[in-house]
Amino acid sequence: WIMGHMVNNIKQIDEFVNLGSNAIETDVSFDKKANPEYTYHGTPCDCGRDCLRWEYFNDFVKALRTATTPGNSKYDKLFLVVFDLKTGSLYDYQASEAGTKLAKNLLQHYRNNGNNGGRAYIILSIPNLKHFKLITGFQQTLKGEGHAELLDKVGYDFSGNDDIGDVQKIYEKAGVTGHVWQSDGITNCLLRGFTRINAAVANRDSANGIINKVYYWTVDKRQTTRDTLDANVDGIMTNYPDITVEILNEDAYKTKFRIATYEDNPWETFKE
């Protein structure tokens, strides 16, 4: 999965897909009442990027729905969306409410109330383990609205670079048993080692691990891309999807990896 990083403006959806992204990551900021408000990152952000691009959340999600509905030219090119949920502005007790409001919003504006809406898989990426009730609030809301089947298209990620064992315990608390992606990484302005990504891959590949897929961010340089592929990840989050595509076509990688398609299930652990 080639995950276009910080796609917060409607025009950027096309831009990143045209460069080779089959997935995008979008930042979601919340208002004081825990409503998803903007697709916005703000400063500071990755080196070489404009941190201030934004849309109203509802507008972005409607445009995303159009792009990921059968009949659109991007439909079979873009099929995974990571919502990077900026819950740091919320009190811990608001996490469940944020999940409820996000679910209602996506049900209406993205899934079109289950009536031929957007078809992409969605990952809820949460920066704080304490906010695990966002997941339960989200799940209970979709079930309560009579759309439990839409949870088949929803996965989860904790993005705070916490200890993998702690992450697994929180999933147990939240009752999550699958659809788990694990991110690791740091802004492209800094270097980060592979110790934790290796631990995440080991959990993914162990019999009793909870992780299904692992991705690393933000991978922009050619050598870092090679090192990341050598760590056996499933996804690369990048500001330059075309560089990821270029490296995947190198002799060392083109027989070992392939770019994911709409037919690939992002919740299935890949077994060699």
Curated annotation (Swiss-Prot):
Disulphide-bridged cysteine pairs: 45-51, 47-189
Cofactors (names): Mg(2+)
GO terms assigned for molecular function: lyase activity; metal ion binding; phosphoric diester hydrolase activity; toxin activity
Primary location group: secreted
Tissue occurrence: Expressed by the venom gland.
Binding site for Mg(2+): 25, 27, 84
UniProt KW keywords: Cytolysis, Dermonecrotic toxin, Disulfide bond, Hemolysis, Lipid degradation, Lipid metabolism, Lyase, Magnesium, Metal-binding, Secreted, Toxin
Ranges in a coiled coil: none
Cofactor remark: Binds 1 Mg(2+) ion per subunit.
A GO CC term attached to the entry: extracellular region
E.C. numbers: 4.6.1.-
Compartment(s) where it occurs, according to its Swiss-Prot or TrEMBL record: Secreted
Catalytic reaction list: an N-(acyl)-sphingosylphosphocholine = an N-(acyl)-sphingosyl-1,3-cyclic phosphate + choline; an N-(acyl)-sphingosylphosphoethanolamine = an N-(acyl)-sphingosyl-1,3-cyclic phosphate + ethanolamine; a 1-acyl-sn-glycero-3-phosphocholine = a 1-acyl-sn-glycero-2,3-cyclic phosphate + choline; a 1-acyl-sn-glycero-3-phosphoethanolamine = a 1-acyl-sn-glycero-2,3-cyclic phosphate + ethanolamine
Record has rRNA-binding as a keyword: no
Record: active site: 5, 41 (nucleophile)
Alphabetical GO biological process terms: killing of cells of another organism; lipid catabolic process
Family: Belongs to the arthropod phospholipase D family. Class II subfamily.
Function of the protein: Dermonecrotic toxins cleave the phosphodiester linkage between the phosphate and headgroup of certain phospholipids (sphingolipid and lysolipid substrates), forming an alcohol (often choline) and a cyclic phosphate. This toxin acts on sphingomyelin (SM). It may also act on ceramide phosphoethanolamine (CPE), lysophosphatidylcholine (LPC) and lysophosphatidylethanolamine (LPE), but not on lysophosphatidylserine (LPS), and lysophosphatidylglycerol (LPG). It acts by transphosphatidylation, releasing exclusively cyclic phosphate products as second products.
Protein name: Dermonecrotic toxin LvSicTox-alphaIC1bv
